[in-house]
UniProtKB/Swiss-Prot annotation:
This is Dihydropyrimidinase-related protein 1. One of its GO terms (biological process) is negative regulation of neuron projection development. The gene is Crmp1. The modification Phosphotyrosine is found at Y504. One of its GO terms (molecular function) is hydrolase activity, acting on carbon-nitrogen (but not peptide) bonds, in cyclic amides.
């Protein structure tokens, strides 16, 4: 349970807590027991526990005791067009804790061509000084350049990073070609990394954006129109196909449409190691808001891939999440203020992309999935915490209520009603894409590193109390299957005798130079070949002929042609 970090926090490790009378919910079992926490770890689980004196006791009164949520898709302090997203690491992680999430994995987004290592250190320093909860970092590969392989090796071997995101969209900025994706997947598999993919067809999006702007459509609806779900689905299919040829796991971030989700579900049935992550937004709302008459409201929903304009999509994605076709829920939390969004008031392609969700994620999942009977409480723990911990090699330190695991614990009230609104959320932005939603399920108490940070609606945190959690490569949940498949389904040549028969000699093909344009024709116009006049002939009876010296026979009168006479008027 050791970890690397820059600082120690004595006031956290001195806390001793006893949670009494709760019902422990893990991804695979539920049971009644007490839980004793000390030194930031779960020390005992059971009934009639013997604990030291002076321990603070929390009465759960039969309520659920679950592992703290893990949000693996956040963009705090993300740069965009000279701006940064509205919530920094303090504001964002504070909101996360208020919603029951006790760990995040944030995205490092380097400027294209800049050093991955330098960018990682920049993000690490910002998070280390501000984060209120434990955190880790993905590193996004925004360009495939000379020296990137060496930096990736250092990040995996020395910096505790085991996940990297590549982009199939954002043409001329982050987008990789298929051959670059193949190279990146192959190299990252060798490092034992988790490959995250932002899946959209960037080439076609660029064409659609141009076409729609030329039509005079400049508002947020243009964002959805230029990124139809077919372009998300096509890229998902292509990413899975590339990963399948290499036998490497692939994780599709921000699954937003039915089509994309269907492709993931079908692929998993056929065998590829693919994982899908819908976000709170795609589970809790839809893209009809892009057509709102209120520009600021419409712009608040702009994110990529866009929310589906089909209002039945959230329910559909929730069903696939419940049956295991999708495995993890993130938030994609990257909100910008209305003033920042207004940079694109005359051009939808300039609206900075991102929505809120870091605080609302767990409540939205409970309300849409568990309160409707689509999934049970164990599945809820799996898709909000445990599956992420297993995929990103945090398990069982995170994602489980077990002796020895980190004391990141939430007492959850499934019956508590909560209204999602910008008036009370912890994010700094003035809007909330879930505005007015009445939801079942909410945290009563949130414990991070063994310390109570949220209770009775009040949050008590300080900057920098979160720790960086390093992650080792080759997570068993993924790579155990990769190793077995390599042995069972590896490519092998056919053993056969040497061919000793004739071999056709292929003549060397001369290189033909392009003909120079003649003076009579324009070089820009292709001259068609001359057309033969079928009524003309070079045969002539005048003058000397080649057979003039041959002896000629005397003429004979032909009585009838071969086959006898014919009469074209007779059919008999």
């Amino acid at each position: 349970m050791s970890h690397q970090g820059k600082k120690s926090i004595p006031h956290i490790t001195s806390d001793r807590l006893l949670i009494r009378g709760g019902r422990i919910i893990n991804d695979d079992q539920s049971f009644y027991a007490d839980v004793y926490l000390e030194d930031g770890l779960i020390k005992q689980i059971g009934e009639n526990l013997i604990v030291p004196g002076g321990v603070k006791t929390i009465e759960a009164n039969g309520r659920m005791v679950i592992p703290g949520g893990i949000d693996v898709n956040t963009y705090l302090q993300k740069p965009s067009q000279g701006m940064t997203s509205a919530d920094d690491f303090f504001q964002g992680t504070r909101a996360a804790l208020a919603g029951g999430t006790t760990m995040i994995i944030d995205h490092v987004v380097p400027e294209p061509g800049s050093s991955l290592l330098t960018s990682f250190e920049k993000w690490h320093e910002a998070a280390d000084t501000k984060s209120c909860c434990d955190y880790s970092l993905h590193v996004d590969i925004t360009s495939w350049y000379d020296g990137v392989r060496e930096e990736l090796e250092v990040l995996v071997q020395d910096k505790g990073v085991n996940s990297f995101q590549v982009y199939m969209a954002y043409k001329d900025l982050y987008q990789m070609s298929d051959s670059q994706l193949y190279e990146a997947f192959t190299f990252l598999k060798g490092l034992g990394a988790v490959i995250l993919v932002h899946a959209e067809n960037g080439d076609l999006i660029a064409q659609e954006q141009k076409r729609i702007l030329e039509m005079g459509i400049t508002g947020p609806e243009g964002h959805a129109l230029s990124r139809p779900e077919e372009l998300e689905a096509e890229a998902v299919f292509r990413a899975i196909a590339i990963a399948g040829r290499i036998n490497c796991p692939v994780y599709i971030t921000k699954v937003m449409s039915k089509s994309a989700a269907d492709i993931i579900a079908l692929a998993r049935k056929k065998g590829p190691l693919v994982f899908g992550e819908p976000i709170a937004a795609s589970l809790g709302t839809d893209g009809t808001h892009y057509w709102s008459k209120n520009w600021a409201k419409a712009a608040a929903f702009v994110t990529s891939p866009p929310l589906s304009p089909d209002p039945t999509t959230p329910d559909y994605l929730t069903s696939l999440l419940a049956c295991g076709d999708l495995q993890v829920t993130g938030s994609g939390h990257c909100p910008y203020s209305t003033a920042q969004k207004a940079v694109g008031k005359d051009n939808f392609t300039l609206i900075p992309e991102g929505v809120n969700g870091i605080e609302e994620r767990m409540t939205v999942v409970w309300d849409k999935a568990v309160a409707t009977g689509k999934m049970d409480e164990n599945q809820f723990v799996a898709v909000t915490s445990t599956n992420a911990a297993k995929i990103f090699n945090l398990y069982p330190r995170k994602g489980r209520i077990a002796v020895g695991s980190d004391a990141d614990v939430v007492i959850w009230d499934p019956d508590k009603m909560k209204t999602l609104t910008a008036k009370s959320h912890k994010s700094t932005v003035e809007y909330n894409i879930f505005e007015g939603m009445e939801c079942h399920g909410s945290p009563l108490v949130v414990i991070s590193q063994g310390k109570i940070v949220f209770e009775d609606g009040n949050i008590s945190v300080s900057k920098g109390m979160g720790r960086f959690i390093p992650r080792k490569p080759f997570p068993e949940h993924l790579y155990q299957r990769v190793r077995i498949r390599s042995k069972v389904f590896g490519l092998h040549s056919v053993s056969r005798g040497m061919y000793d028969g004739p071999v056709y000699e292929v003549p060397a093909t001369p290189k033909h130079a392009a003909p120079a344009p003649s003076a009579k024709s324009s070089p820009s116009k292709h001259q068609p070949p001359p057309i033969r006049n079928l009524h003309q002939s070079n045969f002539s009876l005048s003058g000397a002929q080649i057979d003039d010296n041959n002896p000629r026979r005397t003429g004979h009168r032909i009585v009838a042609p071969p086959g006898g006479r014919s009469n074209i008027t007779s059919l008999g």
